[in-house]
Curated annotation (Swiss-Prot):
Biased composition (Basic and acidic residues): 1-10, 20-54
GO CC, any one term: nucleus
Name listed for the protein in its UniProt record: Histone H2B.4
Species the sequence originates in: Chlamydomonas reinhardtii
Stated family: Belongs to the histone H2B family.
Cross-link Glycyl lysine isopeptide (Lys-Gly) (interchain with G-Cter in ubiquitin) mapped to chain: K149
Protein purpose: Core component of nucleosome. Nucleosomes wrap and compact DNA into chromatin, limiting DNA accessibility to the cellular machineries which require DNA as a template. Histones thereby play a central role in transcription regulation, DNA repair, DNA replication and chromosomal stability. DNA accessibility is regulated via a complex set of post-translational modifications of histones, also called histone code, and nucleosome remodeling.
Segments for region (Disordered): 1-60
Subcellular location: Nucleus; Chromosome
Length: 153
């Protein structure tokens, strides 16, 4: 509808004086630019904007934590025991730290071997290097079991 408004003043101004044209044209052009920009902005924002806003909100609100998994393991090991929010936060930080150490070590191993891909073998070696003694053996055992379960079914 905006182009119709622009067309009418242009045809009415054709018979008008030159000063009236000079005043009306900038107003008509500004109105036309606004009219053209506004629908395109709305059209662009509605389909993409909603998706982008949701994605941004999800990214902001979805902070990845291990709290749920820590709680599940706690209930498997000690069903009648609870955990405070401060202790849960400490456990979450601990897991993030260990994950970062293992990932860094696996990345280094991958670079040493001049291979672009970090495989389960690099992860296993990194776990052996990062974790001490018996803990490393149990972690490797559980990791191997998890990979076997994942690949088989």
């Amino acid at each position: 509808m905006a182009p119709k408004k622009d067309e009418k003043p242009a045809t009415a101004e054709a018979g008008a004086e030159a000063p009236a044209k000079a005043e009306a044209k900038p107003k008509a052009e500004k109105a036309a630019k606004k009219a053209k920009k506004e629908p395109s902005k709305k059209a662009a924002k509605e389909p993409k904007g909603d998706g982008e806003k949701k994605d941004k909100k999800k990214k902001k609100s979805a902070v990845e934590t291990y709290k749920l998994y820590i709680y599940k393991v706690l209930k498997q090991v000690h069903p009648d025991t609870g955990i405070s929010s401060k202790a849960m936060s400490i456990m979450n930080s601990f897991i993030n730290d260990i994950f970062e150490k293992v990932a860094t070590e696996a990345s280094k191993l991958s670079r040493y071997n001049k291979k672009p891909t970090v495989t389960s073998r690099e992860i296993q070696t990194a776990v052996r290097l990062v974790l001490p003694g018996e803990l490393a053996k149990h972690a490797v055992s559980e990791g191997t079991k998890a990979v076997t379960k994942f690949t088989s079914g």
